[in-house]
Amino acid sequence: MRLSQFHLHTTKETPADAELVSHRLMLRAGMIRKLASGLYTWSPLGLRVLRKVEAIVREEMNRAGAVEVLFPTIQPRELWDATGRWEKFGGQLLKIKDRKEQEFCYSPTAEEAAAEFARQEINSYKQLPLNFYQIQTKFRDEIRPRFGVMRAREFLMKDAYSFHLTDEDMAREYDNMRAAYTRIFTRLGLDFRAVQADSGAIGGDASQEFHVIADSGEDSLAFSTGSDYAANVEAASAAPPAPRAAASEAMQQVATPTQKTCEDVAQLLGIALQRTVKSVAVMTQAGFVLVLVRGDHAVNEIKLAKVPGLADYRLANESEIREHLGCEPGFLGPVNTARPVRVVADRDVAALADFVVGANVSGAHLVGVNWGRDLPEPETVADVRNVVEGERAADGGELRLARGIEVGHVFQLGSQYAQALQATVIDEGGKAAVMKMGCYGIGISRIVAAAIEQNHDDAGIIWPAPMAPWQVVVCVINPKQDPQVLAAAQALLDQLLAAGLDAALDDRGLRPGAMFADMELLGIPHRVVVSERGLAAGTFEYRARTADAAESLDKAGLFSRLGH
């Protein structure tokens, strides 16, 4: 391919509203152009990258035994009413009417369509298991589309739906898809983590997200240096605490007139922050609850909501705190409460001895507090905190925190969608059985942006080789002035293509500096320069995108550098 015959339009300027590096670089490289809020046209250059990602995803899905289909993007309200998601999905669901006033939605996902297709097509357990996947445009009516294609309203997605007779078979396919996703992101050359996750609005039991590691990621992740353990911070856990030590101090009240935070109290008393306990007052339908975490820890709201009886909790107001504890906020504690209260202690707090808590007296704290002596053992002990960088993981490694961009998600849905749409088969006993479903999504257009967030420098994109629009670009100096140089460059291009390399020829006639800057901006892994001087010496100027300098190579050396 000659770039003089290809549409390539790079720019130096980017709109002020392009916040993320990926958004700025995709605009500068001419990969995308904005059509409307959250809607982007993919240029020929951008589409080359998108199709390369799509091809790897398709190859690995086929390898895993999934079968490609194509569901309608416009889906009738009746299906979504049956599952309850017409209302539950919220404002992101774009609802439309046809000329007959029949209601439809532009699908953001296709569980309903897949379950309906399975209901029509699968009659017997002998046809199972089956896994249908599609690669198709989706639409979610984001309130504030931002970050370019990272959070666009329209996006390209691979979504797959598997059908099973038993939970065990559903779990096997879940593991099969996790393995396929690992192969996909490995082949794409991305630094990623598979993390335990919450199922969210889609629902289901087991759930795992795949995140590309990037400083700009919206999600906080924790992973261990000792194994492949990784989890979203909402689900991450550290190693259990050591057994509680014996009490060695007597409880006494100390004055803390202006010290309302654990940090201030620890500094006043000259003790480690880990010995202090933070008391968080919440209200539930059943009443007042005091949640205890160590002073150096923070309550994890999602974990806390999973504690029995706390699903609907909210923070208590000052009047509720005074009613139950008899003091103002800042001096709360589980000892000598004005009224009996339920105590939920984080497991690290339950393992403390000689700790410090608020005295339920304004301007005072208690030191030397011990469970079983100064207050009853906690009614509930649970992991209700966020993990901390560097602490010990359950596998013996250290926990590391990072930011991640979610690019894939796998779910075990169970029977909820199949039940709602009456997707049944005849089982071995001749009876109707509701099928089990799995759901597996990959954001293909999002992967492109995530890869740039992870791989760039001041000059532009640094594509992982499998995603680059071309692996090699042959750059010609003064092609119009020297036909011999252009002919030599074309001959080299033909040899590169014959060797199986995805290559192009830059014969646009730009000044060398501008041409080289474009190649760096576009993230081309290998740049080869053909010039009159080089031809005379029998060499080519070669530079890898990540190299500090160019080098002169003969043809054999060049092909060796390119792995051929």
UniProtKB/Swiss-Prot annotation:
Its EC number is 6.1.1.15. This is Proline--tRNA ligase. Homodimer. Consists of three domains: the N-terminal catalytic domain, the editing domain and the C-terminal anticodon-binding domain. GO terms for molecular function: aminoacyl-tRNA deacylase activity; ATP binding; proline-tRNA ligase activity. PANTHER family: MITOCHONDRIAL RIBOSOME PROTEIN L39/PROLYL-TRNA LIGASE FAMILY MEMBER, PROLINE--TRNA LIGASE. It comes from Xanthomonas axonopodis pv. citri (strain 306). HAMAP family: Pro_tRNA_synth_type1 (MF_01569). The keyword ATP-binding applies. Keywords: Aminoacyl-tRNA synthetase, ATP-binding, Cytoplasm, Ligase, Nucleotide-binding, Protein biosynthesis. SUPFAM superfamilies: Class II aaRS ABD-related, Class II aaRS and biotin synthetases, YbaK/ProRS associated domain. The keyword Ligase applies. It holds the Pfam family tRNA-synt_2b. Catalyzes the attachment of proline to tRNA(Pro) in a two-step reaction: proline is first activated by ATP to form Pro-AMP and then transferred to the acceptor end of tRNA(Pro). As ProRS can inadvertently accommodate and process non-cognate amino acids such as alanine and cysteine, to avoid such errors it has two additional distinct editing activities against alanine. One activity is designated as 'pretransfer' editing and involves the tRNA(Pro)-independent hydrolysis of activated Ala-AMP. Belongs to the class-II aminoacyl-tRNA synthetase family. ProS type 1 subfamily. One of its GO terms (cellular component) is cytosol. PROSITE patterns: AA_TRNA_LIGASE_II.
